[in-house]
């Protein structure tokens, strides 16, 4: 599904998704969706509070938004220090939970490709090694016009700027 540019966070010096340390989608979702995923076992069963409003994440800053029944969900896809990922994956409350084994190659690497889900800026709902077969990130970014060393590239309006200036000058002449 499409994500608004203000809700997509990426390493500032990255030129594409694969060269970034990681990327995140930061947006508000309905609290019942998070509760359903907690009940089904996808997310950890952590108590959630209502998220405070952040107008920078809202789709339209001019509309009045209601702060009830929404959770700020940050989904991070990228490299995480292996020792922190191991620590986050061990749930102290679960006795019969399966133990996730790291291969020797993962043990030697300082970073591991992972997927992290955080609610309201501080509640860890999910931490796991990258579950995708090709170990890629489930995000696709499309720059309209590629500009060297810039992730976002050049937009449609920026691309037409010089052409419009030339047409305006031609009409005035």
Where are these regions (language model features)?
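Extended alpha-helical, oligomerization-prone segments that build pores/tubes and scaffolds
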Residues: 1-173
């Amino acid at each position: 599904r499409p994500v608004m540019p203000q809700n997509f966070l990426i390493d500032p010096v990255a030129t594409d998704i694969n060269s970034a340390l990681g990327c995140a989608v930061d947006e508000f979702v309905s609290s019942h969706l998070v509760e359903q995923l907690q009940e089904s076992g996808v997310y950890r069963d952590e108590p959630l509070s209502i998220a405070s409003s952040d107008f920078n994440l809202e789709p339209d800053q001019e509309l009045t938004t209601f702060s009830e029944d929404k959770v700020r969900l940050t989904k991070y896809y990228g490299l995480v220090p292996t020792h922190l990922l191991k620590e986050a994956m061990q749930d102290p409350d679960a006795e019969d939970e399966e133990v996730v084994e790291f291969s020797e190659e993962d043990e030697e690497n300082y970073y591991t490709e992972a997927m992290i889900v955080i609610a309201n800026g501080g509640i860890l709902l999910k931490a796991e090694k990258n579950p995708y077969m090709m170990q890629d990130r489930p995000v696709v970014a499309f720059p309209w016009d590629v500009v060297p060393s810039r992730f976002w590239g050049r937009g449609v309006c920026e691309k037409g700027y010089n052409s419009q200036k030339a047409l305006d000058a031609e009409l005035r002449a």
